From Swiss-Prot:
This is F-box protein SKP2A. It is found in: Nucleus. It holds the Pfam family LRR_6. Polyubiquitinated and subsequently targeted to proteasome. Auxin promotes this ubiquitination-mediated degradation. SUPFAM superfamilies: F-box domain, RNI-like. Induction: Cell-cycle regulated expression with higher levels during early S-phase and G2/M stages. Repressed by auxin through a ubiquitin-dependent pathway (at protein level). Only biologically active auxin promotes proteolysis of SKP2A. One of its GO terms (molecular function) is ubiquitin-protein transferase activity. The gene is SKP2A. Changing L128S: 60% reduction of auxin binding. 70% reduction of auxin binding and loss of ubiquitination-mediated degradation. It comes from Arabidopsis thaliana. (indol-3-yl)acetate binds at S127, L128, N149, L150, S151, G152, N175, L176, C177, G178, N202.
């Protein structure tokens, strides 16, 4: 593997330090832990796993030094691999187990919960075989979870989601896209009651949720920044009004195919932008973002909307763009909204008109 300049410099510094301290390496097992971990940070996870079997010294060093592991490359026998690895890698904070085909079962997730108590980020997307047992285990074994991806997991219930939120109250990012059975108004009420640090929530294609569930979220998760409601066909303007009123830091909202959304929802968003600009839209970390407020809005297939209402949203949030290459206001399938334009296009048009043209 080719090393970058910074990584190569760090290794050189380690070797120089060893030279100054008179440390000699006669066998691989003699490599200092600090140097071993720096070397392993430069190779892929397959080689890290191989290295953990070289000798007991390496195994112990990796066991207590490895904090990130990705096994999404494993196309076969991931369940067995997880069962064999997690008892050794007890200091993991980030674990990616994304699958192209269902492999993971409840016993593997239970092993993770039993051994990896410091876990903060876990990707279990497309784990079609895991059930409520897995979520109950995570609730008790991994209370420090801040990021959890369960997208495409279809075999657990809303009761298990509610139970998980009672114990994993630090969750900030939760992906439940396609979890139709598990995502109900009761599940959203539990998230709103227990996870007030939530910042990003994907509920795409969870078609059973209604305004009651979304309003519970809005009231309970005021720090929400990103919310995907694409394909949530039952929600109406009431959901968007609640989000506009309570989630003043909202930056990205997906409403694709929410055909019950009307102009009232758009005007509530526009009004929230005007109302919150003086104080709360200002970014705390100046320089990272010019201002807060909506930067991404998907209203594709929301065919009840009119140009004036959508233009009002666009005018309230200058970070929404319709111009080529910067599309952050997505309106596919809304043929009546072709006249809606962002500030960039209007400014370019004015600049063009201001330039004197030679007489013909």
């Amino acid at each position: 593997m080719v090393m970058g300049g910074e990584a190569s410099m760090e290794l050189d510094q380690c070797f120089q330090k060893m030279k100054m301290e008179g440390i000699s390496i006669k066998e691989w097992k003699d490599i200092p832990v600090e140097l071993l971990m720096r070397i392993l940070s430069l190779v892929d996870d397959r080689n890290v796993i191989v290295a953990s079997g070289v000798c007991t010294g390496w195994r112990d060093a990796i066991s207590f030094g490895l904090t990130r592991l990705r096994l999404s490359w494993c196309n076969n026998n991931m369940n067995s691999l997880v069962l064999s690895l997690v008892p050794k890698f007890v200091k993991l904070q980030t674990l990616n187990l994304r699958q192209d085909k269902p492999q993971l079962e409840d016993n593997a997730v239970e092993a993770i919960a039993n051994h990896c108590h410091e876990l903060q980020e876990l990707d279990l997307s497309k784990s079609l075989k895991i059930t409520d047992r897995s979520l109950y285990a995570l609730a008790h074994g991994c209370p420090d979870l801040t990021k959890l991806n369960l997208s495409g997991c279809t075999s657990f219930s809303d009761t298990a989601i509610a139970y998980l939120t009672r114990f994993c109250r630090k969750l900030k990012v939760l992906n439940l896209c396609g979890c139709v059975k598990a995502v109900t108004d009761n599940a959203l009420e539990a998230i709103g009651n227990n996870c007030n640090q939530m910042q990003s929530l994907n509920l795409g294609w969870c078609e059973n949720i209604s305004d009651d569930g979304v309003m519970s979220l809005a009231y309970g998760c005021p720090d929400l920044r990103t919310l995907d409601l694409c394909g949530c066909v039952l929600i109406t303007d009431e959901s968007v009004v609640a989000l506009a009123d309570w989630c003043v830091h909202l930056r990205s909202l997906g409403l694709y195919y929410c055909r019950n959304i009307t102009d009232r929802a758009m005007y509530s968003l526009a009004q929230s932008g005007v109302k919150n600009k003086p104080g709360s839209w200002k970014s705390v970390k100046k320089g990272k973002y010019d201002e807060e407020g909506l930067r991404s809005l998907n209203i594709s297939q929301c065919t009840a909307l009119t140009p004036s209402a959508v233009q009002a949203v666009c005018d309230s949030f200058p970070a929404l763009h319709t111009c080529s290459g910067r599309h952050s206001l997505v309106m596919s399938g809304c043929l009546n909204l072709t006249t809606v334009h962002c500030a960039c296009i209007l400014q370019a048009h004015r600049a063009h008109n201001a330039v004197p043209h030679p007489a013909h």
